[in-house]
Amino acid sequence: MLVISGWLNIYAAEYNPDIHNSIFSFNTSAGRQLIWIFSSVGLISVIMLLDFRIYDSVSYLFYGLCILLLIAVLFFGKEVAGSRSWFSLGSFEFQPSEIAKFGVVLAMARYFSKSTRKTSELRIQITGFLLFLVPMILVLLQGDAGTAMVYGSLVFVLFSEGMHPVILIGALVVVILFILTLVANQLFLIIGIILFAILIIGLVGKSIRKIMLAIVTALASIGFVLSVDFILNDVLKPHQQKRVMSLINPNADPLGIGWNVTQSKIAIGSGGLLGKGYLEGTQTKFDFVPKQTTDFIFSTIGEEQGWIGSVVLIALFITLFLRIIYLANRQKSGFARIYGYGVMSILFAHFALNIAMTIGLFPVIGIPLPFFSYGGSSLWSFTVLLFVFLKLDAHRMQVLQRI
């Protein structure tokens, strides 16, 4: 349902009443997407025909191949929109970071399921962390911060395998501090951290260990606040800096970096409750919203199907996520269960980041909406991720053994 709805909206996003291209025409993105859809059906057939145990057996080998591809694309890849993350072979283009998501989830599932020690142990957690940190860094080196953030979502797999919640809270604090540093006076923020640390020290009483922890945390927080300028100006690329600043102040450059989000919000808002009707979107017809078949496909739904259509789409995604969680929790093998959590993490990250980006709650980072946006590499990646899990679920009553 998501794929067909996405295909129809890809056509709507490019529809021009003066040209009258058929939805099946290969001159349109919708026509080309149809090729990817049918090829995905072929992928599903292959997945279902293969022995379910092979995914466990080849996980490390496939992970290694993905790492090699991520390294190779740094040297031989094609640069698109500031990111060197594509292999180009004539008219065929391939993004290895998409299929590498599958490789990373496989490797994490195998590692945690085969561990002879408790998965909550620090050494096991660190190794699991490194399994997705390495490709995450390689993707960052390609200049694709959005996809790197998707890899970061696999931290929830660590959480499912016993990672202490304090680590997740710490990561959230880092994000909040980063945002506050951009919007608030740096001196006032540091004073606030010091006062908060003093309050905590007063509450913990005479516990030296807790007092030292509060002091170290405060010093680390202050150090991070002071380093944000370096991160923003020296680590992020110019186009990424502009995207972050446009989130803080979208009106600073309404005709430049802020144009995409502004027009997307106008399109969504103009749809009202019921929308303007299929193929009747004025923002869409006159190409006000850039990249509307890919990154901003949700704005097409908002304009033409309105608030009701947007809610229905979100409900479909939530239903999918809840179903994946249910299936993961009923697995008889650790490999299948952990793999399911990984699939859920990847899909949810794409869903949340794409919609947040479209409505102006997150910087524009080039993240497709799963099964919905135009693109062959992403559709193949999502198809493989999901249907391998469904294949494992179909054999859940059998003990997963290495071939």
Residue ranges and their predicted role:
Residues 144-149, 276-281, 292-294, 356, ...:
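Transmembrane helix boundary and interhelical junction motifs in multipass membrane proteins
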Residues 354-403:
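A juxtamembrane structural motif centered on a specific transmembrane helix
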Residues 8-16:
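Membrane-helix interface motif
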Residues 94, 263, 371-372:
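Short hydrophobic beta-strand that contains or immediately precedes a catalytic carboxylate
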Residues 243-297, 305-309:
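TM-adjacent membrane-interface loops and short helices in multi-pass inner/ER membrane proteins
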Residues 8, 79, 84, 260, ...:
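Gly/Ser/Thr-rich beta-alpha loop segments that engage phosphate groups in nucleotides
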Residues 3-4, 8-9, 23-255, 302-359, ...:
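Hydrophobic alpha-helical transmembrane segments of multi-pass inner membrane proteins, especially
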